[in-house]
Amino acid sequence: MKNCWLQNKTVLITGGASGIGAGIARLLITKYACKVIAVIIDDTGLEQTVRELGENSGNFTCLYYDVSRYENWIKIKKYLEDNSVQVDILINNAGIFPAFGRFENVAKDELENCLNIDFYSVAYSIQVMYPHIGKSDTPAFVTISSSAALAPIAGTAPYTAAKSASKALTECFAFEHPEIYVGCVCPGFTKTNLFSRQKEDISKNKLISAFMSKRDRMVKKIVHGIKRKKCRMIYGADARLMGFLFKFFPKSFPRFFRWIMKISKQPMFEDVFIK
């Protein structure tokens, strides 16, 4: 463990109060003695995260900012430097998943909100934080994208577009800076509150839940991948399968998946098929 490059690092993570972000924060703190600074917009899930950290909660702090605003990243950078905090690793994890529906029916505000949080927050943070993190002995940038970036799914146009863009941006940034570690994660469906905007409570849907990975299992895979400095991380059987099928069957797979969604009669997919 002493030789692990993650040991005793200072990590800045967006969306670290709950879900995958909170899980990553907890594992980095408890296993690698990291100090984690979570950038969050509200306290949703925070109490449980602090409780799970227990005596290690002293290594977990929060900054309250809307990460989709460029000027807030300027403020975050200034706060860190004014307080002599050197961040080693930036993990872009914040994200929202709008309800399934046809693209032409997506409200302008909802479209902009999804793009701002799922894509622009990644772009802004990397641009602003690069000069600061570049001063670290072990600078690293990690983006939590999605399996949606591997294969398009009917009803997810804003989310898929934003996550695909964040994946592409991260990989381009990696090619521009081979001297630092840049990783991109494409996790499959995971049991978190990401799906809170859907028409039904996914946690109570046994059919959908059966295809979802447990959060802590997904977190362990992600952190292990970061530990090994993997550039592209695709985790979850559904993510690997989606990527494979779309790669070799780019026309028939999306149609087949749409057909499965339709015959499943799941409430969360209803708006995809309403003309």
Regions flagged by a language model, labelled:
Residues 17-19:
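Conserved glycine-rich cofactor-binding loop
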Residues 33-48:
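Conserved glycine-rich Rossmann-like NAD(P)H-binding loop of the short-chain dehydrogenase/reductase
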Residues 64-75, 108:
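The beta1-alpha1 cofactor-binding region of Rossmann-like NAD(H)/NADP(H)-dependent oxidoreductases
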Residues 101-103, 107-112:
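Substrate-binding pocket helix/loop in short-chain dehydrogenase/reductase
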Residues 126, 162:
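Active-site helix of classical SDR
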Residues 146:
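Residue(s) in the substrate-gating loop at a strand-loop-helix junction
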Residues 174-237:
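SDR active-site lid
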